[in-house]
Amino acid sequence: MLLAIKAFIAPVIVACAMFMESVDANVIVTALPEMARAFGRDPVTLKIAVTSYVLGLGVFIPVCGWLADRFGARSVFRTAIGIFVVGSLACAASTSLATFTVARFIQGVGGAMMVPVGRIIIFRVVERSEYIRAMNYLSVPAMLGPAAGPLLGGFITTYLHWRLIFFINIPVGILGIWLTNKYIKNTREPHPGPLDWVGFVLSAGGASLFLLGLSLTDGELVTGTTATVMTVIGAVMLGIYVLYARRVERPLLDLRFFRVPTFQASVLGGSLFRIGLGAVPFLLPLVLQEGLGMSAFESGLITCASAFGGMFMRTLAATVLRRWGFRTVLMYNAAYSGIAIAACGTFFPGTPTWLIWLIVLLGGFFPALQFTSLNSMTYAEIESRDVGRATSLGSVVQQISLGLGVTVAGIVLSITRAVHGHAALQWSDFWPAFVVVGFCSFASILVTRKLSANAGDEIVRGKREVTTK
């Protein structure tokens, strides 16, 4: 009986923790203008807070598997929840943009460990016969988080106070730690092997300095010279890592996986696509609130339409892929997605609410098909023994791309406003940013068009072999 309870409750615990992380990743976007006023900053400068969270997620993902093997999955998962709760408290108590940015990075680190280690727990604790049902639990946060986050954040910001957004995580986190201690066994590997610390310092440090340096070019927190130096040092560290990874047998992030055609197209093409998609959750609430004068809750009601569009498309994705194949879908759908993103730049004060909602809905509908296609095909030609390491590389690139999207959007928005001579954001300042990030998603066609016509057939049609050209 106790084993049955543990087999049921372990996936529920992990799913709840993932839901907390998924909601938190989306909850602040509708609160950004109000937070900016509280910190005495321009709303665009809060891009650094969004970027720091994504960065915390990205740079720590590669070490999560090793930590779980070395210290035990339960111990790391429990610590991850604790770090996330501490980060939430720090966010709620922040009195400046600098402290809030650091707090969001801490949250990102906790979130980075929660998701992959949670999957490890499911794999080790749940019986194989129950594995599919357990994974279904884990799919719920990915679907509901993007919808619940903007709604919850908008409601709390409009009718209560934005700081209360982060207090929600505290009781949930404490309960999660208690349930983890009670129901999840602390499994570990007897011989985890060494961690590539040199690779971790070079890749994590390089990515952090490069992305944060770009985000700080507006001169709000540091001087432009300091931001430029950070960016250059980060780029140099990443370059050194590329040379280092070629000479090490098992580097932390094995760049040799890019030699696999489907992996290369999915990750590199997906990176361009995610630059566009990563910017939308940042830009959309700003244009709705600062440009069109909506409240945080009103913008949340519209922003969540994207998540509903994504949910609907997921029910059709398998059928679409079987009918047209990965290459065709990835190419045409990237174009549709880029157009849908750019269309958000057409919003002006007289735009009907129903039309805005429809465009945002389509802005979630087409990207959901793209993500499903990319995620399904990424590891199609990777040997099963290498999937774990390939996943680490793919996950890091994905997160960095999302953060880069926010940074690019913020830079374009700042330039446009300066050209227009606006002291505060106006609706007319946003269209160039939407067009630029929409073009980034559109440009992913240049990578995915190199795929063979039958790429991914093994997945959608059950073929044993895939021929690539």
Predicted segments, located by residue:
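Intrinsic disorder in cytosolic terminal tails and internal cytosolic loops
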Residues: M1-K6, E189, R449-K469
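12-transmembrane solute porter fold
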Residues: A7-V23, I28-T30, P43-V44, A49-V50, ...
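MFS transmembrane alpha-helix packing/gate-lining sites
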Residues: D24, Y53-F60, G110, P141-G145, ...
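Extracellular/periplasmic helix-loop-helix junction of adjacent transmembrane segments
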Residues: A31-I61, L97-T101, F297-L301
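Small-residue (Gly/Pro/Ala) motifs that create kinks and tight helix-helix packing interfaces
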Residues: L32, G145-T157, H161, F210, ...
